[in-house]
Amino acid sequence: MSTVTKTITVLPGDHVGTEICNEAIKVLEAIEQATPYQKIHFEFKHHLIGGAAIDSTGVPLPDDSLAAAKSSDAVLLGAVGGPKWGTGAVRPEQGLLKIRKELNLYANLRPCNFASDALLELSPLKSEIVKGTNFTVVRELVGGIYFGERQEQEESADGESAWDTEKYSVAEVTRITRMAAFMALQHNPPLPIWSLDKANVLASSRLWRKTVDKVMKEEFPQLTIQHQLIDSAAMILVQSPTKLNGIVITSNMFGDIISDEASVIPGSLGLLPSASLASLPDTNSAFGLYEPCHGSAPDLPENKVNPIATILSVAMMLRLSLDSLKEAEALEEAVRQVLDSGVRTADLRGTNSTKEVGEAVVAAVTKILKDAA
């Protein structure tokens, strides 16, 4: 069996970014050593992004970071930003927007579920309401109002107004609909799809709904699609989140808001992974960028951040970009075992450190893979 080499560009970013990336790398190295399913080698290339890049180079995304990302199989990102860099002309978050655009990462995937039923009690909602919640938000990431034409207040003739534009094309909506459909078809039976929009008010949402319907009818007639207005969906998410189980597809801004709302259901942002893909994972080798849903947590002392979201992002990477499904399943099971055993950071009412949780996952995934040999 020949060794397959997979190149991963690591962009730790700012504050806790370095710590969580370190734990994720340890997990990948453990999988490389222990997996009986293939001979695989992970090659890591470390580069700057965000505030760390601004401090070192003056820009939030240096050219060498972008070039490294483009030439790798996948990108692992820590977190960017912090009060140190403020809201001036050059901001850490610009690096994130630029890399998404430059790598054409058009689909953001954010699962909302419980890594372990032992965590149900941590949800701010009642256990009986959230038990069984399991959906993935598929958010369009490079179109819509965040990338539309705009005018700042200072640029207006009277200095009294500002505007942004929400624009979507049929091609953009078709592409994200296919991604959602593909994610639904990865399951047996296929998952239902919910499309969220504001078609009762917005022209862009009417195009969105019409295009989603056309693509689903012509290309995926075996799948079920239901439309929900975004404000109604926001209510359902709190009242009865399991109603949205399946795949939830929506635009850039609506997806930004609804996925953040969904992120509080499992009780901690420290649990939630995300993937941003540039192509369909139809051969389990889509190019993607993987990062936790939480931010850089500048106020958190060292060795306190929860590494689980980043480790579960690695599980998504193994499944969608690195063609390592068995290893992804083993890693998710390892996380479940560690959380069930009570090894947890403070955000999950635990007493363990970042490194202790990371080491526990390394030990668990190593055992699972070796037992499978």
Curated annotation (Swiss-Prot):
So, what pathway does this thing act in?
Answer: Amino-acid biosynthesis; L-leucine biosynthesis; L-leucine from 3-methyl-2-oxobutanoate: step 3/4
Substrates-to-products reaction catalysed: (2R,3S)-3-isopropylmalate + NAD(+) = 4-methyl-2-oxopentanoate + CO2 + NADH
InterPro entries assigned to the protein according to its UniProt record, in alphabetical order: IsoCit/isopropylmalate_DH_CS, IsoPropMal-DH-like_dom, Isopropylmalate_DH
What positions does the entry give for NAD(+) binding? 82-93, 295-306
List residue numbers at the site (Important for catalysis): Y146, K198
Q: Which UniProt keywords apply?
A: Amino-acid biosynthesis, Branched-chain amino acid biosynthesis, Cytoplasm, Leucine biosynthesis, Magnesium, Manganese, Metal-binding, NAD, Oxidoreductase
Give a yes or no for keyword tRNA-binding in this entry. no
* Co-factor note (free text): Binds 1 Mg(2+) or Mn(2+) ion per subunit.
Q: Which GO terms describe its molecular function?
A: 3-isopropylmalate dehydrogenase activity; magnesium ion binding; NAD binding
Which EC class, in a word? oxidoreductase
List of residues binding substrate: R100, R110, R139, D231
Subcellular localization(s) per the UniProt record: Cytoplasm
EC number(s) stated in the UniProt entry for this protein: 1.1.1.85
What family does the entry list?
Belongs to the isocitrate and isopropylmalate dehydrogenases family.
Q: Tell me how this protein assembles.
A: Homodimer.
Q: What does this protein do?
A: Catalyzes the oxidation of 3-carboxy-2-hydroxy-4-methylpentanoate (3-isopropylmalate) to 3-carboxy-4-methyl-2-oxopentanoate. The product decarboxylates to 4-methyl-2 oxopentanoate.
Instruction: Kindly provide the name given to this protein in its UniProt entry.
Output: 3-isopropylmalate dehydrogenase
Q: Which organism is it from?
A: Scheffersomyces stipitis (strain ATCC 58785 / CBS 6054 / NBRC 10063 / NRRL Y-11545)
